[in-house]
Design a protein with these regions (language model features):
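Non-heme Fe(II) oxygenase catalytic core, chiefly the N-lobe of the double-stranded beta-helix
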Residues: 2-248, 254-298
């Protein structure tokens, strides 16, 4: 049995797994159950290479390379390097700002992200935490009238942040070159979206990539999305995750919003990231993912 310690107000961590020694099938089942029950799963103090990291991530789902390809890992394009470290020539070695605003990874794709994994390689002296906001709890707390209002609605998503008012105001992570933009379609997702594994409804990506609502005037749609985002990111729904060197954190994109936090530019930080996609809609979930996740692991 793997020992899990609760984070607060959701999420769990464990020191019982050493990915450098491989991961038994039974242990993976335990980890996956803890992941779906608690939305955030941290594997502390890992010492693995890029191949071992991607092997673990593939257990969670099919990896999808990030559209910003200039910061792919040199040995595997499925790993995105997040870093403020520069090389000897002064060139960036990674993507410095991966989203210091609440958002959902890959919500701009037709088949969005199941999970994101971050592996902390260099930790800053101060800050660099990740904030998570529980969108299942946020949906549950909505008034009945608001739940009824949003039930039939689909939000319009594309790459970026709706609070970037123009190209000049965008963060580095939000500005794509023409070839990268061509890969990014405009798609829609339900605002009140059932979780693809547990079936629990959550507010889905109401902050970040949601720019409008199908069939609704722009101003009205923006007001509704902003109202939902303000509700969904209240401190009572948030977890602040603090990294140690070698920590791996995995989070459930169907259930959470998340945000990076800024650090002193002089303080070095590097992480590796792999994001894996959900099972295609309509595909049967593996038997081990039958609804056994209603109660958190505590």
């Amino acid at each position: 049995m793997i020992a899990f310690k609760p984070l607060a107000p959701f999420g769990v961590e464990t020191f019982d797994i050493d990915l450098s020694k491989g991961l038994a099938a039974a242990d993976f089942v335990e980890l996956e159950r803890a992941f779906y029950a608690n939305q955030v799963l941290a594997l502390r103090a890992q010492h693995i290479d890029a191949a071992q990291f991607i092997d673990f991530a593939r257990r969670l789902g099919p990896p999808q390379p990030h559209v910003i390809d200039q910061f792919h890992h040199p040995t595997d394009p499925n790993i995105l390097i997040l870093s403020n470290v520069k090389d000897a020539a002064g060139r960036p070695t990674g993507l410095q700002d991966a989203g210091s605003y609440f958002h959902t990874d890959y919500s701009y794709l037709a088949v969005p992200a199941r999970a994101t994994t971050l592996y902390s390689r260099i930790v800053p002296k101060v800050g660099g935490d990740t904030l998570f906001a529980n969108q299942i709890a946020a949906y549950d707390d909505l008034p009945a009238a608001m739940k009824a209002r949003i039930e039939p609605l689909r939000a319009i998503h594309h790459y970026g942040n709706r609070n970037d008012v123009d190209e000049a105001s965008r963060t580095a992570a939000s500005v794509l070159n023409d070839a990268q933009k061509a890969k990014m379609p405009v798609i829609t997702h339900r605002i009140a979206r059932p979780h693809p594994v547990t079936g629990r409804k959550a507010l889905y990506a109401v902050s970040g990539s949601s720019f409008g609502i199908v069939g609704m005037p722009d101003d009205e749609a923006r007001d509704l999305l902003d109202e939902l985002a303000t509700h969904a990111t209240q401190p009572r729904y948030q977890l602040r995750f603090r990294y140690g060197v070698g920590d791996i954190v995995v989070w459930d994109n169907a259930a959470l919003l998340h945000s990076a936090t800024l650090i002193d530019p002089a303080d070095a930080r590097t992480l590796w990231r792999v994001t894996v996609l959900e099972v295609e809609p309509g595909a049967a979930a593996p038997e081990v993912l039958a609804p056994t996740y209603a109660a958190p692991v505590r």
